[in-house]
């Protein structure tokens, strides 16, 4: 009972409050300081976004990471996320990786606690200790990830498996520890405590979000991850998350990830000494039942706790082909083209994509003051306390997350049955009266969204009675007669969030009807002696309330007296040899689940251990351009509204020297270039409406063809037809109408950009391809056109047309 009570107490009484929130100046200084050591990297800093399963390699062919899409069974991620979501709590320990703010993060499994004020080292984490009976819910997830790791990186898995002490394994795997992150955009960092001889794994186990790709900062490669995806990677490379992609600050999203690793300090001599000390004590205790009779020490390798050496890569769109599992059949030919593209001053990129792969004087990047703080979603707003608790964003966000702890299932393990029954009945009574009042209000005004609180109504009386019960619940959780002001503020914020959620979810009221602010005002009434209307009540009612309050207090005191006689276990002082007491078998067959080893074999079937070499065979490439509507060059002198051409955003876009070169250059598709050979690569050119007949190509490049097709259905049909002529990868080259920094910008600035961007890119398309009114689309709109799997995106750096190359597998 104590572990659950301790967890509730920690979560309710230990989180940011208005008094604890630093000033705006202090937060700004902390943000700047954090970024010096751990900068954030946005999408604009990367060149490649890898969407599909792939093996990423560095400049010497060493594996950076292996990405596998939808590789985890849904039952495993669902079961694990249901338990592990509670492990991610506000912690200042990782604030340096979150711009100085406390992110939602936590650890589970076993941990060394080296350098920590925790006295007892090398043991179960508090989370696993307190959730030992439920801990097996994570075993299927851990088993599947381990077998996938073993399949794709067998030598590293074996080294890790040989080094990890058996008593700190999670369900027999080579993982000792899990790190759980919720809504946490990490700044650039390495995982210094992970075992040097192995790899770590990360899985997204729950979420509904866009963006937040895992980026390998030194390689300029992003890996967007979604639920059930797994990445086996060298965590000693610097990595971070790109920006969250939301359209407005109120947009709902969630993201829960889990990192699996062997914490190498658990295999050092000091940890083995701790294991043996505990085991010796257990063997002298007749009541103890250790699961092993001895501790076998293993070689732990040499762990330097330093970043891995970086051997840079010079990616091109064709090099990406060689990394993608789905395109392995054309990888060797892709590398042949890549090697020609990588030659300094090679004209091949312009022939294929219409421009160079990189441009140093393209559209200028944004100033820092034009961008949102990288941790904006987790940062707290200024405190505007107006009642029983602070209304800072940090407090309200945390309170909503913890409101579940006032449900019956949680409280039943923390307070007496008598006090719990009072809480349940008082809450039910108040909700019943709220429902009655709300039904009456919407009967006369169906569109109503605000709840009119009547201060002398039975509902108001029931609310204050519920507050009296809640106050005793709070004191029962604290095990004392009075709470500090800070403890009260913390509890009342959770209490209000709990009632707000109950009204929204159970009574189906609009979110704003029973708002947190409204409840806060009423809690202020309660804090002023119970209610400011008490003196106006009849004497009999006043006496009834006093007696009711006394009975609730007595129920809580009886609960406290009963608990004083119970033996309690405390994680901080737990010195037992309780390693592996949580372990048990998983009945995969009984549940009808795939056996992890066989499942891993299936989901890794397309993974190839050896790096591919470039072929010497002939490579056929077709470049398709939009046919110009006439033989005349596109007219740049098109009349545009003055409010567009004089806007700050238009002036900024037009200030680029690269943009001015596009406007002055010859139209790219007035005539077709003659077919030619560049070493082993045969280049063929065609207009979009006169493709070669009865010919097939290894690669086809559609150069801004879809922007000449305003109808989405026509564009999709055109892409579908490419299957008949392309045997390898289809490259779709298009403008992304949203700039690369779009989702980092302050929202008003996005509106200003949106007002001019379509006209700006239409102007460039008229000059470059003669397209009268190009249909420039957003990333999401372009990708929605594809009837095939989009495996990756290659972003031409500094491109004046914001050009992106999409790699499609024509399966």
UniProtKB/Swiss-Prot annotation:
The enzyme's E.C. designation: 1.14.11.6
Residue numbers binding 2-oxoglutarate: 255
Superkingdom of the source species: Eukaryota
GO cellular component terms, A-Z: nucleus
Reactions catalysed: thymine + 2-oxoglutarate + O2 = 5-hydroxymethyluracil + succinate + CO2
BP terms from Gene Ontology: base J metabolic process
Family of the protein in this entry: Belongs to the TET family. JBP1 subfamily.
Oligomeric and partner information: Monomer. Binds to DNA as a monomer.
Function field: Dioxygenase that catalyzes the first step of DNA base J (beta-d-glucosyl-HOMedU) biosynthesis by converting thymine to 5-hydroxymethyluracil (HOMedU). DNA base J is a hypermodified thymidine residue found in the genome of kinetoplastid parasites, which is localized primarily to repetitive DNA, namely the telomeres, and is implicated in the regulation of antigenic variation. Also specifically binds to base J-containing DNA (J-DNA).
Protein name, UniProt field: Thymine dioxygenase JBP1
Organism whose genome encodes this protein: Crithidia fasciculata
Lineage of the organism: Eukaryota, Discoba, Euglenozoa, Kinetoplastea, Metakinetoplastina
């Amino acid at each position: 009972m104590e572990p659950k009570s301790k967890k509730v107490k920690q979560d309710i009484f230990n989180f940011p409050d208005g008094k604890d929130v630093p000033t705006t100046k202090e937060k700004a200084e902390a943000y700047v300081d954090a970024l010096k050591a751990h900068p954030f990297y946005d999408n604009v800093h990367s060149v490649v976004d890898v969407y599909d399963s792939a093996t990423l390699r560095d400049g010497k062919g060493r594996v950076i990471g292996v990405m596998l899409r939808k590789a985890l069974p849904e039952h495993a991620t669902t079961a694990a996320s249901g338990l592990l979501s509670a492990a991610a709590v506000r912690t200042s320990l990782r604030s340096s990786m979150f711009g100085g703010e406390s992110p939602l993060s936590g650890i589970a499994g076993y941990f060394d606690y080296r350098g920590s004020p925790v006295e007892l080292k090398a043991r179960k984490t508090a989370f696993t200790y307190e959730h030992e009976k439920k801990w097996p819910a994570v075993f299927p997830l851990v088993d599947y990830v381990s077998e996938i790791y073993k399949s794709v990186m067998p030598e590293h898995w074996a080294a890790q498996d040989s080094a990890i002490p058996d008593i700190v394994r999670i369900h027999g795997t080579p993982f000792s520890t899990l790190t759980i992150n919720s809504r946490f955009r990490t700044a650039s960092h390495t995982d210094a405590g992970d075992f040097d001889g192995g790899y770590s794994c990360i899985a997204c186990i729950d979420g509904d979000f866009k963006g937040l790709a895992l980026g390998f900062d030194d390689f300029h490669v992003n890996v967007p991850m979604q639920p059930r995806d797994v990445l086996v990677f060298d965590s000693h490379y610097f990595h971070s998350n790109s920006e969250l992609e939301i359209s407005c600050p109120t947009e709902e999203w969630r993201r829960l990830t889990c990192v699996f690793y062997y914490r190498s300090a658990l295999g050092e001599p000091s940890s083995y000494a701790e294991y043996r000390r505990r085991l010796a004590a257990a063997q002298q205790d007749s009541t103890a039942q250790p699961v092993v009779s001895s501790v076998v020490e293993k070689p732990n390798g040499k762990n330097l706790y330093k970043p891995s050496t970086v051997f840079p890569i010079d990616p091109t769109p064709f090099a990406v082909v060689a990394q993608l599992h789905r395109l392995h059949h054309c990888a060797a030919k892709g590398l042949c083209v890549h090697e020609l593209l990588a030659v300094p001053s090679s004209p091949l990129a312009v022939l294929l994509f219409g421009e160079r792969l990189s441009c140093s004087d393209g559209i200028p990047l944004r100033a820092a003051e034009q961008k949102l703080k990288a941790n904006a979603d987790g940062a707290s707003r200024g405190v505007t306390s107006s009642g029983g608790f602070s209304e800072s964003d940090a407090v309200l966000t945390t309170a909503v997350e913890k409101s579940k702890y006032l449900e019956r299932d949680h409280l039943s393990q923390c307070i007496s049955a008598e006090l719990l029954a009072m809480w349940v009945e008082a809450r039910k009574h108040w909700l019943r009266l709220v429902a009655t009042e709300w039904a009456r209000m919407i009967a006369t005004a169906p569109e109503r969204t605000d709840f009119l609180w009547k201060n002398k109504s039975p509902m108001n009386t029931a609310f204050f009675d519920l507050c009296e019960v809640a106050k005793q619940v709070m004191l029962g959780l604290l095990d004392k007669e009075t709470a500090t002001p800070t403890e009260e503020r913390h509890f009342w914020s959770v209490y209000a969030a709990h009632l707000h959620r109950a009204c929204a979810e159970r009574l189906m009221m609009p979110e704003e009807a029973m708002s947190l602010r409204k409840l806060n005002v009423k809690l202020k009434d309660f804090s002023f002696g119970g209610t400011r209307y008490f003196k106006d009540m009849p004497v009999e009612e006043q006496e009834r309330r006093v007696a009711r309050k006394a009975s609730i207090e007595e129920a809580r005191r009886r609960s406290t007296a009963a608990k004083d006689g119970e033996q309690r276990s405390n994680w901080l002082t737990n010195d037992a040899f309780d390693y592996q007491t949580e372990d048990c078998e998983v009945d995969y067959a009984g549940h009808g689940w795939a056996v992890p080893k066989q499942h891993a074999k299936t989901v890794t079937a397309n993974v190839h251990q050896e790096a591919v070499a470039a072929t010497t065979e002939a490579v056929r490439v077709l470049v398709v351009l939009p046919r110009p509507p006439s033989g005349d060059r596109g007219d740049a002198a098109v009349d545009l509204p003055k409010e567009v051409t004089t806007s700050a955003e238009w002036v900024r876009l037009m200030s680029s020297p690269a943009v001015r070169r596009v406007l002055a250059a010859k139209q790219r598709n007035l005539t077709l270039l003659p077919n030619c050979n560049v070493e082993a690569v045969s280049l063929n050119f065609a207009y979009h409406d006169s493709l070669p007949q009865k010919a097939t190509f290894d690669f086809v490049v559609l150069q801004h063809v879809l922007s000449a097709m305003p109808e989405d259905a026509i564009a999709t049909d055109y892409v579908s037809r490419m299957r008949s002529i392309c045997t390898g990868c289809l490259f779709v080259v298009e403008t992304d109408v949203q700039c690369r920094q779009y989702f980092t910008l302050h929202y008003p600035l996005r509106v200003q950009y949106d007002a001019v961007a379509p006209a700006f890119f239409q102007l460039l398309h008229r000059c470059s391809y003669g397209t009268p009114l190009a249909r420039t689309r957003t990333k999401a709109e372009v990708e929605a056109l594809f009837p095939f799997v989009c495996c990756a995106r290659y972003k031409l750096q500094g491109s004046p047309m914001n050009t992106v190359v999409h790699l499609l597998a024509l399966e």
